[in-house]
Amino acid sequence: MIRHVFLWRVAPTADPAKVLAILSELPERVPGIRNFALGKFRDDLGTPPFAWDYGLSCEFDSIGDLATYFEHPQHQDIIARLEPMISDRAVCHFDAAGAANPE
């Protein structure tokens, strides 16, 4: 199982609700996504200077499925729609089965 994590900051002129609405379309538009989660940073413990505004995580059965997701036309459409609304981003994907014992 491959876990994909996407973190981002919303551009000052963008509507955060619109960004979330667009990203929430992913599971319906792109096949192969598992355990999709999307949300705003929780500042219950304060906000460190390195915090991101929002996060998305999902899983794929294989690295091949993740590659298919990256190249899928619907995923590419969502990226194009989000580009002007996101000021900064970070992406990480890793083997979720080995998450407890990273090498």
Place the predicted regions along the sequence by residue.
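Residues that form generic nucleotide/phosphate-binding pockets
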Residues: 22, 81, 85
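Interfacial aromatic-anchored transmembrane helix boundaries in multi-pass membrane proteins
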Residues: 87-89
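N-terminal soluble domains immediately following signal/targeting peptides that reside
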Residues: 73-75
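Short, flexible helix/strand-to-coil boundary loops that buttress conserved ligand/catalytic motifs
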Residues: 70, 79-82
